[in-house]
Amino acid sequence: MKILAKWLALAVLLCTMPAKAALDIVITEGVDAARPIAVMPFQWQGAGAPPQAIADVVMSDLIRSGTFKPLDELGLPQRGIGALAQFDASAWANVGAEAVVVGSVKPYGTDQFLVSFDLIDLVKAQNQALKGPTSATEFLMDSRQTVISAAQFRQYGHRISDIVYEKLTGIRGAFLTRISYVVVNHSQKAAYSLMIADYDGYNEQMLLRSPEPLMSPSWSPDGRRLAYVSFENKKAEIFVQDLYTQVRTKVSSFPGINGAPTFSPDGKSLAVTLSKDGQPEIYVIDIATKAAKRITNHYSIDTEPSWYPDGKSLLFTSERGGRPQLYRVDLNSGKVTRETFEGEWNLGGSITPDGRSMIFVNRTNGKFNIARMDLSTRFMQVLTSTRLDESPSVAPNGTMVIYGTTYQGKQVLAAVSTDGRFKARLPVGQGEVKSPSWSPFL
């Protein structure tokens, strides 16, 4: 307990770090196949310089989505444009992009700024230009203005990205989400830190620091709480922490393994792995009462539970077939069905939010990679070519996966699109990073 009192840094809960990216995203593959789009620098209508370049945030978001490729602004016409009223369709006749984002920023009181932006359908504008004069409003896909503070520039940039992404793809954007992960730095006495950051690595916050291992963070469906495993008391225990009130509750401290917590879709329960009755089995714990209900009962190891979106079944890893494979258990009937058969091992699975695909770690020829299986066709696609991949977590819109891997001998985070085309690494400056978890929509 003396070690805990000295090193467990609960006092630094949600202590915001400097405004820089803790995880520097390095894109490694997929930009050339992305859809071209134009994002113009937002017109500044004030003295000096704006607090931040919102267009840079939007461009970075769209690149990281793996879906879009912003064009170099130096090759674009009307570089001073700030609104639809200034748009000249004929000037854009030969620009090979499907849309253009334009906007403006102007002071609007003390530490207040009015941000306006328009999303223009460039393909429609080019087609209409061939037919003769027409109203520019016919090209307008979205137009908004909002008053924000200087501290909100980056967040509002993510909001614009969400709008643009959804308008052009029909899929909700996930740029205003967060990720949690564990940083391990053995040069420090409290080597383990549970961190939270924006999806792109900015606005990093420390939730907990400990000299003992921290692992398996999992978000609640409302994004208010985080469940995780801590060894701070020299044994595995599961905690749930409210990110706003800082209230921290010990949910499971049974003898043996207490691991792999994951919130139910209604946020009232945790699916966990416990070994209190012998072999590791799957249980569901009521968070309010802490009552644990046993779900599986087999002499082999059952672990890594995750919920189906309807909350009626669990996906889990089991060795009951001789090697680790993924199984589904119906919570009402208790019926267990094997889900994976390809490759040597399949483990660490989760179902995408739309319920159509399964994301998991596949081992084939001794290599561990992230894979996706279509649940209707049962077709499996290996998404990554990195080494020793683990702990995949799916974005709430189902388009991207963040996972742990090894690069140059260090544990780092990486991301891949669920179609496998876009890939990126997210290295951290100090230490190693593992156990990522993507938040729900916030």
UniProtKB/Swiss-Prot annotation:
Signal peptide extent: 1-21
Subcellular location: Periplasm
Key word Signal present: yes
Main location as per UniProt: periplasm
Membrane spanning residue stretches: none
GO biological process: one example: protein import
A GO-annotated cellular component: periplasmic space
Family matches, as InterPro entries: 6-blade_b-propeller_TolB-like (IPR011042), PD40 (IPR011659), Tol-Pal_TolB (IPR014167), TolB_N (IPR007195)
Keywords: Cell cycle, Cell division, Periplasm, Signal
Superkingdom of the organism of origin: Bacteria
Gene3D superfamilies cross-referenced by the UniProt entry: TolB, C-terminal domain, TolB, N-terminal domain
Keyword Cell division attributed: yes
Pfam annotation, one family: TolB_N
Subunit structure: The Tol-Pal system is composed of five core proteins: the inner membrane proteins TolA, TolQ and TolR, the periplasmic protein TolB and the outer membrane protein Pal. They form a network linking the inner and outer membranes and the peptidoglycan layer.
NCBIfam families named among the record's database cross-references: propeller_TolB
Function: Part of the Tol-Pal system, which plays a role in outer membrane invagination during cell division and is important for maintaining outer membrane integrity.
Family annotation (PANTHER family): PROTEIN TOLB (PTHR36842:SF1), PROTEIN TOLB HOMOLOG (PTHR36842)
HAMAP family, per database record: TolB
Recorded family membership: Belongs to the TolB family.
Name recorded for this polypeptide: Tol-Pal system protein TolB
